[in-house]
C-alpha cells in the first residue's frame, strides 16, 4: 500500500478524552474514531490489526476442533426468558421492539441462542463432543464506558460453546479451550496468565480469566513469578490427547494466580516472597464450565449409550478481539507510539522515501516495494512529500516492526538504512541484502 493513497488520519495532539495509552494511541494513529459514547468506527489501519487478531483466533479455534458459525446480533427475548436471564441480566442489555411489537434484544452474549441451535439438530451422544464458535459484534450498555475499546459498549467477541454428554467430557472440552487460549495469546505476542475467576452472570462452577500484566490494568492480580517462565504449548500439541492436555493445564494452574475477587491471603502467604508478583492486569479472555445451567431450562438433551435422555454439559469461552488490540498496545509501546508484535502489525514493514521526486530515491523505493510485496511482506510505502521528521514520527506512531529508510546519500552508496522499531537499532545494508533480510522474515 502507498501512503499517498491510504486513509490514515493522524492526530498531532493527544486527545483530551483519552485516559489510557491504548486509547490515546489508537485515536492518534488513525485506528479508530469515536461515534458516540463507547461506540467506535474502525478505520483502515485499525481494521487490519483487528482482522489479523481474528485470523489467529480462528486458526487456533479450528486447531482445537471447534466449528465456526455466525449467529445474529439481534435475538428474541423469548429465548432469554427460557433460561431465566431476560429479567436478571439488568440494564446492560439493550432491549428493543420490532414493528410487530415483539420483544427483541441486542445480544450481549449467546448461550441461549447457541443452545437453541444445538437442541434443534443434535439428538444422539454419537454427535458429541461438539464445539461451536463465532466472531460477532456485541452490545452491553455500560454505565460508564471508558478507556476506548478496552471498555466500550459495542465490541467484537469470539465466543465458543461446548456440548458434552457428561462432566468428564465437558472438563476435557474446557481443557482444550484452556490450551487453545494459551497458544492464541502467545501467537498474538502477549504473555497471558490464567487465573481462577468468579463466574459472574454467565454462571457455572469453574472459570478462568486470562490476564496480561500492565500498569494500566483495571484489576489487581496476584501470581507466582513461575508463570513468567512457563513454556507455551507448541504447534505439535495434540488436542485429541487428553493426557497431554491435562498435563498442560496442571502445569499452568498449579502455581498461585488469582484476581482480586478470588485472592486468598492464606494461600498467597505460601508463595515465597521473592516469587510474589502483585500487579495490575487486563483481562483478555474468560472461560467457563457451567454444566447444565442452560441445557436444563432449555431442554437440550441427547440420547445416551444407555438409551436414555441426558442433559448436555456445557461451557463457554470468550476472547474479545477488539479489546485484545488495545491490550497489545498497553503491553508494547513507548513515548513515540505503538510497537506492534510482528504477528498482528498492520504492515510487515514501512518504506520511507525521504525525497519523493528524486529519481534515485523513487527507483530504490519502488524496487523495495515490489520485492517485498511479491514476497508477502505487505509493505507500506511512504511516498508523500513531507519533511523527514514528520515521516519518522508517523512510522514510529503506527508501530510497524521494521522501517526501511531510503535517502539520497544512501542511494548514492547503494545502501538503505533498516531500523528495528522495538530496539531502535539501525543498520546500513546494500539494497539486495536489505531485501533478502526482510523477505526471509515473511
From Swiss-Prot:
<dbReference type="InterPro" id="IPR004500">
    <property type="entry name" value="Pro-tRNA-synth_IIa_bac-type"/>
</dbReference>
<dbReference type="GO" id="GO:0005524">
    <property type="term" value="F:ATP binding"/>
</dbReference>
<dbReference type="InterPro" id="IPR033730">
    <property type="entry name" value="ProRS_core_prok"/>
</dbReference>
<dbReference type="GO" id="GO:0004827">
    <property type="term" value="F:proline-tRNA ligase activity"/>
</dbReference>
<dbReference type="Pfam" id="PF00587">
    <property type="entry name" value="tRNA-synt_2b"/>
</dbReference>
<protein>
    <recommendedName>
        <fullName>Proline--tRNA ligase</fullName>
        <ecNumber>6.1.1.15</ecNumber>
    </recommendedName>
</protein>
<comment type="function">
    <text>Catalyzes the attachment of proline to tRNA(Pro) in a two-step reaction: proline is first activated by ATP to form Pro-AMP and then transferred to the acceptor end of tRNA(Pro).</text>
</comment>
<keyword id="KW-0030">Aminoacyl-tRNA synthetase</keyword>
<keyword id="KW-0547">Nucleotide-binding</keyword>
<dbReference type="InterPro" id="IPR002314">
    <property type="entry name" value="aa-tRNA-synt_IIb"/>
</dbReference>
<dbReference type="InterPro" id="IPR023716">
    <property type="entry name" value="Prolyl-tRNA_ligase_IIa_type2"/>
</dbReference>
<dbReference type="InterPro" id="IPR002316">
    <property type="entry name" value="Pro-tRNA-ligase_IIa"/>
</dbReference>
<dbReference type="InterPro" id="IPR044140">
    <property type="entry name" value="ProRS_anticodon_short"/>
</dbReference>
<comment type="similarity">
    <text>Belongs to the class-II aminoacyl-tRNA synthetase family. ProS type 2 subfamily.</text>
</comment>
<dbReference type="InterPro" id="IPR045864">
    <property type="entry name" value="aa-tRNA-synth_II/BPL/LPL"/>
</dbReference>
<keyword id="KW-0963">Cytoplasm</keyword>
<keyword id="KW-0067">ATP-binding</keyword>
<dbReference type="InterPro" id="IPR006195">
    <property type="entry name" value="aa-tRNA-synth_II"/>
</dbReference>
<dbReference type="InterPro" id="IPR050062">
    <property type="entry name" value="Pro-tRNA_synthetase"/>
</dbReference>
<dbReference type="GO" id="GO:0005829">
    <property type="term" value="C:cytosol"/>
</dbReference>
<dbReference type="GO" id="GO:0006433">
    <property type="term" value="P:prolyl-tRNA aminoacylation"/>
</dbReference>
<keyword id="KW-0648">Protein biosynthesis</keyword>
<dbReference type="InterPro" id="IPR036621">
    <property type="entry name" value="Anticodon-bd_dom_sf"/>
</dbReference>
<comment type="subunit">
    <text>Homodimer.</text>
</comment>
<dbReference type="Pfam" id="PF03129">
    <property type="entry name" value="HGTP_anticodon"/>
</dbReference>
<keyword id="KW-0436">Ligase</keyword>
<dbReference type="InterPro" id="IPR004154">
    <property type="entry name" value="Anticodon-bd"/>
</dbReference>
Amino acid at each position: 500500500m502507498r501512503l499517498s493513497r491510504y486513509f490514515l488520519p493522524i492526530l498531532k495532539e493527544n486527545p483530551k478524552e483519552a485516559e489510557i495509552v491504548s486509547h490515546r494511541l489508537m485515536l492518534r494513529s488513525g485506528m479508530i474514531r469515536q461515534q458516540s459514547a463507547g461506540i467506535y468506527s474502525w478505520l483502515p489501519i485499525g481494521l487490519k490489526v483487528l482482522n489479523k487478531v481474528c485470523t489467529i483466533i480462528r486458526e487456533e479455534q479450528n486447531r482445537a476442533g471447534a466449528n465456526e458459525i455466525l449467529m445474529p446480533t439481534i435475538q428474541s427475548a423469548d429465548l432469554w426468558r427460557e433460561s431465566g436471564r431476560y429479567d436478571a441480566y439488568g440494564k446492560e442489555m439493550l432491549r428493543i421492539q420490532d414493528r410487530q411489537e415483539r420483544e427483541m434484544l441486542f445480544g450481549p452474549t449467546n448461550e441461549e441462542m447457541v443452545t437453541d441451535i444445538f437442541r434443534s439438530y443434535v439428538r444422539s451422544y454419537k454427535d458429541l463432543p461438539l464445539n461451536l464458535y463465532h466472531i460477532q459484534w456485541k452490545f452491553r450498555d455500560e454505565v460508564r464506558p471508558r478507556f476506548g475499546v478496552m471498555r466500550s459498549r459495542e465490541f467484537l467477541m469470539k465466543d465458543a460453546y461446548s456440548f458434552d454428554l457428561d462432566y468428564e467430557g465437558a472438563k476435557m472440552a474446557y481443557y482444550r479451550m484452556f490450551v487453545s487460549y494459551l497458544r492464541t495469546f502467545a501467537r498474538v505476542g502477549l504473555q497471558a496468565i490464567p487465573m481462577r475467576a468468579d463466574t459472574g452472570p454467565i454462571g457455572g462452577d469453574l472459570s478462568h480469566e486470562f490476564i496480561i500484566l500492565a500498569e494500566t490494568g483495571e484489576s489487581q492480580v496476584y501470581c507466582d513469578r513461575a508463570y513468567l517462565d512457563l513454556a507455551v504449548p507448541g504447534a505439535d500439541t495434540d488436542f485429541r490427547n487428553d493426557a497431554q492436555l491435562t498435563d498442560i493445564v496442571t502445569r499452568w494452574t498449579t502455581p498461585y494466580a488469582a484476581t482480586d475477587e478470588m485472592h486468598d491471603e492464606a494461600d498467597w502467604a505460601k508463595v515465597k516472597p521473592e516469587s510474589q508478583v502483585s500487579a495490575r492486569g487486563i483481562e483478555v479472555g474468560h472461560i467457563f464450565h457451567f454444566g447444565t445451567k442452560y441445557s436444563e431450562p432449555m431442554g437440550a438433551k441427547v440420547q445416551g449409550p444407555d438409551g436414555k435422555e441426558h442433559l448436555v454439559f456445557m461451557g463457554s469461552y470468550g476472547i474479545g478481539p477488539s479489546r485484545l488490540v488495545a491490550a497489545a498496545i498497553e503491553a508494547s509501546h513507548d513515548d513515540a507510539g505503538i510497537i506492534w508484535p510482528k504477528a498482528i502489525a498492520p504492515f510487515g514493514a514501512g518504506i520511507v522515501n525521504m525525497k519523493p521526486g528524486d529519481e534515485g530515491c523513487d527507483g530504490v523505493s519502488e524496487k523495495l516495494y515490489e520485492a517485498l510485496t511479491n514476497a508477502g511482506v505487505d509493505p507500506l510505502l511512504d511516498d508523500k512529500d513531507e519533511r523527514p521528521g514528520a515521516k519518522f514520527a508517523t512510522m514510529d506512531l503506527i508501530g510497524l516492526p521494521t522501517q526501511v529508510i531510503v535517502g539520497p546519500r544512501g542511494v548514492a552508496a547503494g545502501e538503505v538504512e533498516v531500523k528495528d522499531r522495538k530496539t531502535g537499532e539501525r543498520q546500513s545494508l546494500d539494497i539486495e541484502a536489505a531485501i533478502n533480510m526482510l523477505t526471509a522474515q515473511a
